[in-house]
Curated annotation (Swiss-Prot):
Entry note about domains: The C-terminal tail (residues 301-325) is not required for the kinase activity and for translocation into human cells.
Record GO terms (molecular function): ATP binding; magnesium ion binding; nucleotide binding; protein serine kinase activity; protein serine/threonine kinase activity
Recorded name of the encoding gene: ctkA
Inducing or repressing factors: Is strongly expressed in response to the interaction of H.pylori with the mammalian gastric mucosa.
Effect of substituting residue 155 to Q: Loss of kinase activity
S-S pairs: none
InterPro entries xrefs: HipA-like_C (IPR012893)
Class in the EC hierarchy, top level: transferase
Species for this entry: Helicobacter pylori (strain J99 / ATCC 700824) (Campylobacter pylori J99)
Protein name as it appears in the record: Serine/threonine-protein kinase CtkA
Binding site for ATP: 21-24, 37, 72, 88-90, 179
Keywords from the UniProt entry: ATP-binding, Host cytoplasm, Host nucleus, Kinase, Magnesium, Metal-binding, Nucleotide-binding, Phosphoprotein, Secreted, Serine/threonine-protein kinase, Transferase, Virulence
Major localization listed first in the record, in broad terms: secreted
Length: 325
């Protein structure tokens, strides 16, 4: 695969970007505008550095695309002597990005601000917003959650997903999924990759214990992906799992990894292994349970005298948010 050198591309000095992990510049490549993300500068706390953030962004977005979800386009290349990821700017054609945080801030009846990631409050905001038909937005949210579960995304906060607002009509559409640099264990360098591959306890810890979702329960505790997806009765979540599961093509996913330039062989082996493990130990287990619950639901409704419990329309995380006092 030919590699791309962005060094001599025309820079757009009039656009800047937020975010904490690494520098970003705007430039033109093939007459299209891209945001180019650089790897973060070395940290004194190596275990907290995002060593492979550019690889994570590139590979994760291509995997999300393979699932049939709308996602930003990414290219991997170099800028001077650094490996960078270029993310195609989807706001260039008269669209403005409005993040979910901004929307949630308008829910003045909620006790906490738009930044807070309590799942109940997020679902409440989805149900009560007027940007997008709530059922459509809810489907998108749970599809993204299932994808983030497979990819181990620990930072899908309210500021890195949202909407595109047309500047002329003020109409809204759901923005492509973006900012996937916190997927696929970006803090794992080659030494950590080798350590995990040679120790089943280290591997399982990264499946069952962490990374966790940044979404929180009502006890302000981060949601564990395995526990949530294998225990929830949230019909919208289970429907998303049943919808996304048939699209997970591990051969395609492994091909994406194999064809990623610049990546070390041990890093590729690590990603192959971790994605196989996350699928078999989380997604497959949750999917089997989702099928069983779906069958129970159908059987219960086929018999008018059967009082079997129905699947919740929202689950234990029913939108009953804490109100402002």
């Amino acid at each position: 695969m030919p590699t791309i050198d962005f060094t001599f591309c025309e820079i757009n000095p009039k656009k800047g970007f937020g975010g904490a992990n690494g520098n970003k510049i705007s430039l033109f490549y093939n007459n299209e505008l891209y945001m180019v993300k650089f790897p973060p500068k070395p940290s004194t706390h190596k275990e907290m550095s995002y060593t492979n953030g550019c690889f994570s962004e590139y590979v994760a977005c291509h995997i999300v695309n393979s699932l049939g979800l709308k996602v930003q386009e990414t290219l991997l290349g170099t800028y001077k002597n650094k490996i960078v990821v270029a993310c195609k700017d989807f706001t260039t054609h008269q669209y403005e990005l409005v993040d979910f945080l901004s929307l949630k801030n308008t829910m003045i009846e909620l006790e906490k601000s738009g930044k807070d990631t309590n799942l109940n409050d997020v679902l409440y905001a989805i149900d009560n917003q007027h940007f997008i038909e709530p059922k459509v937005l809810k489907c998108f949210f749970w599809d993204m959650f299932v994808a983030d579960t497979l990819l181990g995304n620990f930072d899908r906060h309210n500021g890195n997903w949202g909407f595109l607002r047309a500047s002329n009509s003020k109409e809204y559409q759901i923005a492509p999924i973006f900012d996937c640099g916190s997927c696929l264990y970006p803090q794992a360098d080659d030494v950590v990759c080798q350590k995990v591959l040679s120790n089943i306890d280290e591997l399982n810890a990264r499946i069952y214990n962490f990374p966790q979702s940044i979404l929180k329960d009502d006890n302000d505790k981060k949601i564990n992906y395995y526990d949530f997806l294998t225990q929830t009765n949230n019909k919208d979540c289970l429907d998303a799992l049943l919808r996304i599961y048939p699209r997970i093509d591990m051969n395609k996913i492994h091909s994406i990894i194999d064809n990623t330039p610049f990546m070390s062989e041990i890093h590729k082996e690590f990603l192959h292994t971790m994605l196989d493990e996350r699928k078999s130990k989380i997604i497959d287990v949750a999917h089997t349970r989702a099928i069983e619950l779906s069958l129970q639901h159908k059987q219960a409704h086929s018999n008018p005298y059967d009082n079997a419990d129905d699947l919740d329309n929202s689950n234990e995380y029913t939108p009953t948010p804490k109100r402002r006092r």
